Amino acid sequence: MRVRKRKGAQEYLENNPHYVILEPEAAKGRWCEVFGNDHPIHIEVGSGKGAFITGMALKNPEINYIGIDIQLSVLSYALDKVLASQAPNIRLLRVDGSSLTNYFDAGEIDMMYLNFSDPWPKSRHEKRRLTYKSFLDTYKQILPENGEIHFKTDNRGLFEYSLASFSQYGMTLKQVWLDLHASDYPDNVMTEYEARFAKKGQVIYRLEATF
């Protein structure tokens, strides 16, 4: 879903350099210095308006979180939530998910979240899907051995594609949920999309996979 362009979004991000890392290339290999501790670092690629990343940071203060989104206005709405939360363990990046190795060293990230990514349903756009093999190559470089990806979507086609993509890549599927909200999974933190879909009774799919 497209988000309306937000006036002043660029200046808003630039005026909050504590939370929005404006030169992430300079932080490569030294994210522990950015956060001021050596806690594990989890990233969400495609963080949207920030409900998930903020909720996770408040729930798990012993983990550092980085929300990543390429859309300027979207990231500005995420900043709203981060500022309101005052959580010290969140940072935001406006970068593309295909270029993560420019900003993170090998094994520097402990876990990744992909939530409600664009399904890019047309076959000619397969390479744009965040679970396509070239993206998995990138993720593998910044995660440790046996690093985890947690993935959620309402799109069955993308879910089935991702199951196959992870398996073909040689990843291990730890757990799979075919109807997350009907399960007894206790630790779910919802995104904005997910909360909207849940009200409509839509099925949410989830999986956890390791390299």
Curated annotation (Swiss-Prot):
This is tRNA (guanine-N(7)-)-methyltransferase. One of its GO terms (cellular component) is tRNA methyltransferase complex. Its EC number is 2.1.1.33. GO terms for molecular function: tRNA (guanine(46)-N7)-methyltransferase activity. It catalyses: guanosine(46) in tRNA + S-adenosyl-L-methionine = N(7)-methylguanosine(46) in tRNA + S-adenosyl-L-homocysteine. PANTHER family: 3-DEOXY-D-MANNO-OCTULOSONIC-ACID TRANSFERASE/TRNA GUANINE-N 7 - -METHYLTRANSFERASE (PTHR23417), PENTACOTRIPEPTIDE-REPEAT REGION OF PRORP DOMAIN-CONTAINING PROTEIN (PTHR23417:SF14). Belongs to the class I-like SAM-binding methyltransferase superfamily. TrmB family. S-adenosyl-L-methionine binds at residues 44, 69, 96, 118. Pfam families: Methyltransf_4 (PF02390). It is an enzyme of class 2 (transferase). Substrate binds at residues 122, 154, 191-194. Catalyzes the formation of N(7)-methylguanine at position 46 (m7G46) in tRNA. Residues 124-129 are annotated as: Interaction with RNA. It comes from Streptococcus equi subsp. zooepidemicus (strain MGCS10565). The active site is at 118. Keywords: Methyltransferase, S-adenosyl-L-methionine, Transferase, tRNA processing. Pathway: tRNA modification; N(7)-methylguanine-tRNA biosynthesis.
